[in-house]
From Swiss-Prot:
Name of the featured protein: Endodeoxyribonuclease 1
Keywords from the named record: Endonuclease, Hydrolase, Nuclease
Hydrolase keyword on record: yes
GO biological process, one term: DNA integration
Xref: Pfam families: Phage_endo_I
Enzyme Commission code: 3.1.21.2
Top-rank EC class of the record's enzyme: hydrolase
InterPro entries cross-referenced by the UniProt entry: Phage_T7_Gp3_endoDNaseI, Restrct_endonuc-II-like
GO MF term (any one): deoxyribonuclease IV (phage-T4-induced) activity
Record function comment: Endodeoxyribonuclease I, which is expressed in the late stage, is necessary for T3 genetic recombination and the breakdown of host DNA. In the early stage of infection, T3 DNA replicates as a linear monomer. In the late stage, the T3 DNA replicates via linear concatemers several genomes in length. The gene 3 product has also been implicated in the maturation of these concatemers.
Organism: Enterobacteria phage T3 (Bacteriophage T3)
Length: 152
């Protein structure tokens, strides 16, 4: 999430949102190591190549993306990534999953996720997700983001 938020730094980088900061504090308080915006996952928007940088990678191979505002382009991007990388477990943490897709929409972020089989939560990562068994992540398909160091 873009913005001017820069409350604190980790791994030499400032968080870009208050929600990212809150989730990082949750992980730290539980003694869970994480990589912050380290991995760049390639995906293709038809006729053009793009890179997606998820916010967090947990030790068990689950990627976490935090979202306040979740616009149409973000939703399209997540569908493309899921189609092109079905082996990845990418979950969303919303400021509020009850927010509507757009003004006047009958559909909330959470309802949209349920329709598309995307796991999500509000405010913080559910502890059960952090304790799930390790999943294999095909790191050989990805590039690391320049200037960001791996944790641990």
């Amino acid at each position: 999430m873009a913005g001017a938020y820069a409350a604190r730094c980790t791994q030499g980088r400032a968080f870009r949102s208050g929600l990212e900061d809150k989730v990082s504090k949750q992980l730290e308080s539980k003694g869970i190591k994480f990589d912050y915006e380290l991995w760049r996952i390639p995906y293709v928007i038809p006729e053009s190549d793009h890179l997606y940088t998820p916010d967090f990678l947990l030790p068990n191979g689950i990627f976490i993306e935090t979202k306040g505002l979740w616009d149409s382009d973000d939703r399209k991007k997540h569908l493309l990534i899921r189609e092109q990388h079905p082996e990845l477990d990418i979950r969303l943490v919303f400021s509020s999953s009850r927010s509507k897709l757009y003004k006047g929409s009958p559909t909330s972020y959470g309802e949209w996720c349920e329709k598309h089989g995307i796991l999500f939560a509000d405010k913080l990562i559910p502890v059960a997700g952090v304790k799930e068994p390790k999943k294999e992540v095909p790191f050989d398909k990805f590039k690391t983001k320049k200037g960001v160091k791996k944790n641990g």
